[in-house]
Amino acid sequence: FHRPMKGEMYNRHIRFGTDHGSFHEEMAELLSWRPRVAPEIYDAQTKGQMLYLDADNDQAAATAIEASKHMPVWSRYVLCQDSATHFSIKKKIVNPDCCYIEGLHGMRAPGSVNIADESGSFSLSSKDFWQKYPSAVEAGDLDQDNAEVIFWLWCPQVEAMDFRHYADQGYSQTYYEGFDVVGASAYGIGNTNNFSIELSNNAASDGDALKRFSDS
């Protein structure tokens, strides 16, 4: 899924649904030691509010804008549900030579994500996300003119599916298989996946709204 992105980096938000609320970040987080950003500006940003900073008439706004020029800008996030009891979120800047850093670990993610900018927001979800592990949702190019969201039905971070049998013969008499044929094969496997999308003119979705969307 692709969507145009507009506005300042500090007004671009991402939120993933998690098993205990949500994980929310901005592409340029206005938490700075030098220059010091006014707490009320940073607090409004963390709540998902759009910031309309007037550097010409507000010194606090001018300081925040200057600080934003020296922040790391996060371009890509990946949530991977690699087992029935673990998911991770990692992020990186746009430079391909730089590594990912970890953002969060949890148990079971619902498979929902919300991305917002100054023009509105959109939410996407995948039904039975954690149950169908290893699954992943990746959001990239968040600092560019067009962002993309990819739902991976098989998370590329984990090992490839292995269809080899665990042994070179059957054990129908001594164990549970009931037949001697070695039948490990991908033939005949099928799965239906359901995805939902919601578009909004409003700013970033809060955690409760994203949960309602994911549960619907």
Predicted ranges, named:
Residues 1-216:
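Beta-strand/loop-rich accessory regions of lumenal/periplasmic or secreted enzymes
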